[in-house]
A protein has these predicted regions:
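Short alpha-helix C-terminal cap/hinge motif
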Residues: 1-3
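Exported/periplasmic ABC-transporter solute-binding proteins
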Residues: 5, 9-18, 29-30, 37-38, ...
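Acidic, polar ligand-binding/catalytic clefts
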Residues: 26-41, 46
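A short alpha-helix-loop-beta-strand transition element characteristic
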Residues: 45-48, 109-111
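Short, solvent-exposed loop/turn segments at the edges of secondary structure
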Residues: 50-51, 199
Length: 260
């Protein structure tokens, strides 16, 4: 069993553009599977977990004792604070960060906040995937990073919970989230695609040419079953119980009973 980590969009492109052989693709945004892998490389997409955007930091971060859910954007835009996020074109956490900033501008009624946050986050603070920011936090080279809650929990970091209206965690706020949009590279070279804000939902799919199909399906069965769900919950990642799949009718028999 081997894993290879990258931003979800990068993972999908390794399959579609580089011909990378793999059994499964797990994405932190289920729509990456829908947009980039189905129908040419995969047939179905199981939605199995949720998450929330948070601001991760350590005790050594500037103003760590002061930052809270009401003043975080004021703290971050002080000239001596370094903050970062992952690359939007490579990693859903990156474009979700930009969505959080847009939603924050509306939620806090702070015109120009998105542009200010964007301008004060230099290119060197934008990394290919969100977990790379952890090293910068732990070394003290970065004060704050926009991360998934599960990543902060798993790395033992402090983190600031953002309001539900902007943290992309709640289906109840889906209508508000939709007001945020980010332009990304499209499926064809030089093309563009627009991502719209949605609650964070993770997806998993089996590739059509999976070389180890039965073992891969056994892993999916474990992941969306009680044991896998319990592990996710302990690691700060709420499972979707039961998992859902729009293509349930074509799922392998092993998975059908575990999916709604």
């Amino acid at each position: 069993f081997e894993t290879e980590a990258a931003g979800s969009r990068t993972c999908a492109r390794k399959v579609t553009e580089m011909g990378r052989e793999a059994d499964l693709v797990l994405s932190a945004d289920y729509t990456v599977v829908d947009d980039l892998l189905i129908p040419d490389h995969a047939d179905w997409n199981i939605q199995f977990a949720r998450n929330a955007m948070v601001i991760a930091y350590t005790d050594d971060a500037k103003y760590a004792e002061e930052i809270n859910a009401d003043n975080w954007y004021e703290v971050l835009t002080r000239g001596d604070v370094a903050y970062g996020h992952s690359e939007p074109d490579a990693d859903p956490c990156g474009y979700r960060t930009l969505m959080v900033w847009q939603l924050a501008e509306m939620h806090y009624d702070e015109p120009g906040l998105y542009d200010k946050l964007d301008a004060m986050c230099p290119p060197e603070n934008v990394r290919p995937k969100s977990v790379e920011l952890i090293v910068l936090l732990e070394s003290g080279d970065m004060d704050y990073a926009f991360e998934y809650r599960s990543v902060a929990v798993q790395h033992g970091l402090k983190f600031l919970e953002l309001p539900e209206e902007i943290n992309l965690s709640m289906v109840e706020h889906a209508g508000f989230y939709q007001q945020a949009t980010v332009e990304l590279s499209g499926t064809e070279p030089g093309s563009k695609a627009t991502k719209t804000g949605k609650p964070i939902v993770y997806g998993i799919t089996l590739l059509k040419d999976a070389p180890h199909r039965e073992a891969a399906l056994a892993f999916v069965s474990f992941l969306i079953g009680p044991d896998g769900q319990a592990i996710m919950a302990r690691q700060g990642q709420p499972p979707i119980i039961p998992a859902t799949c729009p293509q349930k009718g074509i799922l392998p028999d092993l998975l059908k009973d575990a999916v709604q």
